[in-house]
Amino acid sequence: MTVFEEIMQAPDKAVPRTYLKKAEALVVFPGTIKGGFIGGVHRGHGILSVRDSKTNTWSPPAFMTLTGGSFGAQIGVEEIDVVLIVLNQRGIENLLSNKFKIGADAGVAAGPVGRDAEASTDIQMRAQVLSYSRTRGVFAGATLKGSALTSDGNANRDFYGRQLSARQIVYEGIGSTVAPVPAWKAMLNRYFR
């Protein structure tokens, strides 16, 4: 079971169906490591998949990296699962720009959770991306201010057998025949209808 499936199994903690229906892309970073001593850093590897609005089908996964830092009195290490629900084409383009920073863009908001989260704030209604995180089984709207998302060229090359950009993978469908890709797309189709 994927991190996203685990999150969706708890209806009171899940991403509301309203946002799943509107989603144009999904980004999942399982097991992002966050650590700190005086200052803090976090780093994770994940995948991006984009929905084709004409065919309602999902792209093969493009591998991405999430990195960031923070200041202040911090000590310790924790593991966080991060989920980003991208609500429009502009949000996708920002993610693919390799200059995207969560928190630097007003288009990112902590996402609502649970069955009754339909009455969203104005910030969430204007957002391009809703962010969620889960730490030790607790799942809530995430604040990942300062985190940068970039394409993970090495992981894409290792998975697809050649150098591909995230844009080539999600828009041109290059790599759709790689064995695990159909299972990934089937999982997305179960939740994003």
Regions inferred by a protein language model and the residue ranges of each:
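Small-residue-enriched, tightly packed secondary-structure blocks
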Residues: 1-193
